[in-house]
Amino acid sequence: MIINEKANDIVTNLEDAERFSINADASMFAILSKKLYSNPIQSVIRELVSNAIDANIAAGVEIPIQVHFPNTLDNIFYVRDSGIGMDENELRNVFTYGGSNKRDSNAQIGGLGVGAKSPFSITESFTVESAKNGVKRTALCFMGPDGRPRFKMIGEENTSESGTKIYFSVADGYANFIRESVPVFLFSVQMPEILNGVETFCNVADVKNIEEFRKLRKLVEKDSHFCRPHMVGPDKNEYIVTKLLNITSQFFSGNIVVMGGVPYDVDISQVWSENYKVSQMFNFDNYSKVAIFHFPIGSLAFQASREKLNYTEDTKKQLQKRYV
């Protein structure tokens, strides 16, 4: 994603002024990892899934990414893509805070240079396997005794595959990973291949299995538009829509925008000075009060955690255009 940071023109005669710098100590890395996300599990799933989808898009492959959920028999969580992979230099760049190879195009979702390191918010170490040009490289990312993250290449072997896999073990709370993946997968650009024999995809909104969840996704995809909101109402499919409404109400306030497959709550009070309600603006009396707005990648600003929108003047203008 192209990051639009505007440079400020300042006229000054202070020629000896020094630039600010960042002290890369343990407290700073804690801010960038363990303290960055309010919902770490959902954020890790979102960031790794988004990166994997980006990798597939860049490689032009239509093979779905793989997501492996932990359980009592196999406690590994992983996300795997079928992209072009990374060599050692590319791995070192991606796993440097602020490092990103996605800032020249809005075809990909990421770009801030923190998402690949998101597992540090819930684990002390994770492993990266990346295959490119016939060589698979394995790197270990771990938190050092000084509280600063470390990166070490630990293996290299020949392979006919390509792509990247990021994985780590989960001690407990397996069901939380399944639950927190719901809002990520509901709007994601690709529906991943879900592994590890998960029979109950989620325990919310009476969605009992993956097939019912896929029906919800089809409804969202069928009615997705990039110009005007669509209002999901019982007149379309009461059985499915009711479940969609139940799901969104558990994770969102009701006003949702989606950019690059990532959903965000909209705080209407941030968009207008008056406290408008979407239900009043759209006369939702005969609908289920769910409006989904789709925006092109790069059109809205978001916070560093990507959990919430950043209500810049440009973002507010974009939102105002859709709400009228």
Model-inferred region functions:
Residues E124-E129:
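Glycine-rich ATP-binding loops of the HATPase_c
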Residues S27, T72, L112:
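Short acidic loop-to-helix transition motifs that present clustered carboxylates
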Residues L36-V67, G115-F120:
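Conserved ATP-binding N-box helix of the HATPase_c
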Residues S27-K35, N39:
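Activation segment of protein kinase catalytic domains, centered on the conserved DFG
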Residues M1-I22, A55-I109, V135-V324:
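Interdomain "switch/hinge" adjacent to the Bergerat
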Residues P40-I45, E90, G110, I122, ...:
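Helical mechanochemical/support elements of P-loop NTPase systems and associated helical scaffolds
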Residues S105-T123:
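Glycine-rich phosphate-binding loop
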